[in-house]
Regions:
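Basic Lys/Arg-rich amphipathic helical interaction modules
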Residues: 1-6, 58-146
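Proline- and acidic/polar-enriched loop/turn elements at helix boundaries
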Residues: 26, 39-40, 113
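Short helix-start
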Residues: 30-63
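Intrinsically disordered, low-complexity regions enriched in Ser/Pro/Gly/Gln/His and often acidic
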Residues: 10, 18-20, 45-46, 114-119
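Polyanion-binding surface elements
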Residues: 1-29
Length: 146
Protein backbone atom coordinates (compact mmCIF):
# COMPACT_ATOMS: atom_id res chain seq x y z
CA UNK A 1 0.00 0.00 0.00
CA UNK A 2 2.96 2.33 0.24
CA UNK A 3 3.32 2.25 -3.53
CA UNK A 4 3.54 5.82 -4.78
CA UNK A 5 1.64 4.75 -7.93
CA UNK A 6 -1.51 4.64 -5.79
CA UNK A 7 -1.22 8.38 -5.18
CA UNK A 8 -2.96 10.85 -7.47
CA UNK A 9 -3.00 14.63 -7.80
CA UNK A 10 -5.55 17.01 -6.34
CA UNK A 11 -7.14 17.39 -9.78
CA UNK A 12 -7.35 13.62 -10.28
CA UNK A 13 -8.93 12.99 -6.88
CA UNK A 14 -11.40 15.84 -7.53
CA UNK A 15 -12.39 14.23 -10.82
CA UNK A 16 -12.75 10.86 -9.10
CA UNK A 17 -15.21 12.28 -6.55
CA UNK A 18 -16.84 14.59 -9.10
CA UNK A 19 -16.11 17.71 -7.06
CA UNK A 20 -13.91 20.73 -7.66
CA UNK A 21 -10.44 21.32 -6.27
CA UNK A 22 -11.80 23.80 -3.73
CA UNK A 23 -13.79 20.96 -2.17
CA UNK A 24 -10.68 18.78 -2.10
CA UNK A 25 -8.73 21.56 -0.38
CA UNK A 26 -11.53 21.90 2.19
CA UNK A 27 -11.59 18.15 2.78
CA UNK A 28 -7.81 18.15 3.16
CA UNK A 29 -8.12 20.83 5.84
CA UNK A 30 -10.73 18.59 7.52
CA UNK A 31 -8.20 15.77 7.63
CA UNK A 32 -8.48 13.88 4.36
CA UNK A 33 -5.19 11.99 4.07
CA UNK A 34 -2.61 13.74 1.93
CA UNK A 35 1.01 12.81 1.44
CA UNK A 36 3.38 15.75 1.42
CA UNK A 37 6.04 15.44 -1.23
CA UNK A 38 9.67 16.40 -1.34
CA UNK A 39 10.48 19.96 -2.33
CA UNK A 40 9.70 20.59 -5.97
CA UNK A 41 7.46 17.55 -6.33
CA UNK A 42 3.73 17.39 -5.98
CA UNK A 43 2.20 15.43 -3.13
CA UNK A 44 -0.75 13.23 -3.55
CA UNK A 45 -3.85 11.50 -2.37
CA UNK A 46 -3.97 7.72 -1.97
CA UNK A 47 -7.12 6.62 -3.72
CA UNK A 48 -8.00 3.89 -1.21
CA UNK A 49 -7.23 5.86 1.93
CA UNK A 50 -9.11 8.86 0.59
CA UNK A 51 -12.11 6.72 -0.27
CA UNK A 52 -12.18 5.17 3.22
CA UNK A 53 -11.86 8.64 4.78
CA UNK A 54 -14.82 9.93 2.74
CA UNK A 55 -16.90 6.84 3.53
CA UNK A 56 -16.12 7.14 7.24
CA UNK A 57 -16.95 10.84 7.26
CA UNK A 58 -20.24 10.17 5.45
CA UNK A 59 -21.17 7.30 7.75
CA UNK A 60 -20.54 9.34 10.89
CA UNK A 61 -22.56 12.23 9.47
CA UNK A 62 -25.41 9.86 8.52
CA UNK A 63 -25.71 8.55 12.07
CA UNK A 64 -25.42 12.12 13.36
CA UNK A 65 -22.28 11.46 15.37
CA UNK A 66 -21.05 14.84 16.60
CA UNK A 67 -18.05 13.74 18.64
CA UNK A 68 -14.48 14.45 17.63
CA UNK A 69 -13.00 11.89 15.28
CA UNK A 70 -9.57 11.99 13.73
CA UNK A 71 -8.85 11.34 10.08
CA UNK A 72 -7.46 7.95 11.07
CA UNK A 73 -10.64 7.11 13.00
CA UNK A 74 -12.78 8.04 9.98
CA UNK A 75 -10.69 5.70 7.85
CA UNK A 76 -11.00 2.94 10.42
CA UNK A 77 -14.77 3.18 10.88
CA UNK A 78 -15.23 2.79 7.13
CA UNK A 79 -12.69 -0.02 6.99
CA UNK A 80 -14.44 -1.91 9.80
CA UNK A 81 -17.84 -1.53 8.15
CA UNK A 82 -16.46 -2.75 4.83
CA UNK A 83 -14.85 -5.76 6.52
CA UNK A 84 -18.23 -6.86 7.82
CA UNK A 85 -19.40 -7.16 4.23
CA UNK A 86 -16.19 -8.72 2.90
CA UNK A 87 -16.21 -12.50 2.99
CA UNK A 88 -12.55 -12.55 1.89
CA UNK A 89 -11.20 -10.83 5.02
CA UNK A 90 -7.77 -11.94 6.19
CA UNK A 91 -5.50 -10.86 9.01
CA UNK A 92 -2.66 -10.48 6.50
CA UNK A 93 -4.68 -8.06 4.38
CA UNK A 94 -5.57 -6.00 7.43
CA UNK A 95 -1.96 -5.91 8.55
CA UNK A 96 -0.92 -4.62 5.13
CA UNK A 97 -3.71 -2.02 5.24
CA UNK A 98 -2.64 -0.87 8.70
CA UNK A 99 1.03 -0.75 7.68
CA UNK A 100 0.09 1.34 4.64
CA UNK A 101 -1.25 4.07 6.90
CA UNK A 102 2.19 4.57 8.41
CA UNK A 103 3.19 6.52 5.30
CA UNK A 104 1.35 9.51 6.85
CA UNK A 105 3.42 9.29 10.02
CA UNK A 106 1.01 7.20 12.07
CA UNK A 107 2.69 4.69 14.34
CA UNK A 108 1.46 1.09 14.57
CA UNK A 109 0.11 2.03 18.01
CA UNK A 110 -1.85 4.98 16.55
CA UNK A 111 -3.41 2.71 13.96
CA UNK A 112 -4.24 0.01 16.51
CA UNK A 113 -5.79 2.53 18.92
CA UNK A 114 -7.94 4.04 16.16
CA UNK A 115 -9.08 0.59 15.00
CA UNK A 116 -9.98 -0.48 18.54
CA UNK A 117 -11.68 2.82 19.40
CA UNK A 118 -13.88 2.69 16.31
CA UNK A 119 -14.66 -1.02 16.78
CA UNK A 120 -15.88 -0.14 20.28
CA UNK A 121 -17.79 2.85 18.97
CA UNK A 122 -19.57 0.74 16.33
CA UNK A 123 -20.43 -1.96 18.87
CA UNK A 124 -21.86 0.64 21.26
CA UNK A 125 -23.79 2.40 18.52
CA UNK A 126 -25.29 -0.86 17.27
CA UNK A 127 -26.28 -1.83 20.80
CA UNK A 128 -27.99 1.54 21.30
CA UNK A 129 -29.86 1.12 18.01
CA UNK A 130 -30.97 -2.41 19.00
CA UNK A 131 -32.21 -1.20 22.39
CA UNK A 132 -34.08 1.70 20.78
CA UNK A 133 -35.62 -0.63 18.19
CA UNK A 134 -36.75 -3.05 20.91
CA UNK A 135 -38.23 -0.18 22.92
CA UNK A 136 -40.16 1.05 19.87
CA UNK A 137 -41.48 -2.45 19.17
CA UNK A 138 -42.62 -2.75 22.79
CA UNK A 139 -44.35 0.62 22.49
CA UNK A 140 -46.24 -0.57 19.41
CA UNK A 141 -47.30 -3.79 21.17
CA UNK A 142 -48.42 -1.86 24.26
CA UNK A 143 -50.32 0.64 22.12
CA UNK A 144 -52.14 -2.15 20.26
CA UNK A 145 -53.12 -3.81 23.53
CA UNK A 146 -54.64 -0.57 24.83
Amino acid sequence: MNNKDCFVSQQEIAEHFKVNRTTIRAWTKQGMPYLDADRGKSGGYHIGHTLFWCMGKSHLEAIEHHGETSALEKIMVARLISLERDKYFSEETEQRFDNGLQIYGYSPEDVSKARNKMAGFLAGWRHAVAVRREHLQQSVVTERES
